[in-house]
Amino acid sequence: MKYHWIGHFKEGTSDKVWGLIRLTDYPRYNDYAAVWGRRGRALQTKIHSDIDAWDADKLCNKKEDKGYTVIDLARLDQVYPEFEEDLQKTAVWAMLKV
């Protein structure tokens, strides 16, 4: 499992994250899990099967266009300390769906 992109959006009462996790490791097409949620709520997922890196980047660019800021793992730990734990639960579930 590999992070492809993590974004954070905070405006008014909205405080949420959106991320894309690479579930497979093939040369061209891969499976990704989009993971999102508001802080303090359960994360949701959507599997994107057999897409290339360009399509994965396109999904991330759409989030940036909507106001999400790219963050690294250190910043993620500050804005959503439970994310790693919640992600592990969600990612295991997502991999079982692939």
Model features per residue range: what roles?
Residues 47-68:
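A short, charged, amphipathic alpha-helix used as a generic interaction element across diverse proteins
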Residues 66-98:
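Intrinsically disordered, low-complexity charged/polar segments
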